[in-house]
Amino acid sequence: MKPLVSIIMGSTSDLPVMEKACKWLNDNQIPFEVNALSAHRTPDAVESFAKGAKERGVKVIIAAAGMAAALPGVIAASTPLPVIGVPIKGMLDGLDAMLSIIQMPPGIPVATVGVNAAQNAAILAAEMIALADEEVAQKVEAWKAGIGAKIEKANKDLAEVKYDFKCN
């Protein structure tokens, strides 16, 4: 089995956040890999990884980083694959990481999700893959139908809650 999604984090300290992406992909049976690579500490390994990802069958890369958050941009500069950046919350509440990821120069785009929004990164990666993979598309559609059903149930439950001045 080849990974369709590659999850890269600057260090294993990002794993508690990125586990949400791993869990979503695993629950939806979308093959993925997880590695720690640092744009600052292992730049050659990052470049080698990024250049070889497409050849290994990877379709989308999710790159998580905090603080200066160079990792997503460095990867995007070295691969033709789409890169999704996940800013990790740190001392500046993730604002530093988010700005580092979204302020890329022309020609080196990085899609960006919210601070610590690893699950959204996994869903976005699956949606990108779903454009050309019907099996993944069906998994995404089924998952979205499931979350819609949860909201419908919540509204039915709320309809049963009684207050004197509640109008619905």
Identify the role of each PLM range.
Residues 2-41:
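Glycine-rich phosphate/diphosphate-binding loop of Rossmann-like nucleotide-binding domains
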Residues 3, 9-16, 20, 95-168:
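C-terminal binding/interaction regions
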Residues 4-7, 32-33, 59-61, 81-84, ...:
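Structural motif
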Residues 14-18, 42-46, 65-74, 92-95, ...:
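Short glycine/serine/threonine-rich phosphate/pyrophosphate-binding segments
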Residues 36, 41-46, 54, 81:
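Short alpha-helical segments enriched in small residues
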Residues 38-39, 64-68, 87, 112-117:
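Active-site nucleophile and cofactor-binding loops and adjacent substrate-binding regions
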Residues 49-87:
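Glycine-rich phosphate-binding loop
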Residues 78-102, 106:
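Glycine/small-residue-rich loop that forms an oxyanion/phosphate-binding "nest" at active or ligand-binding sites
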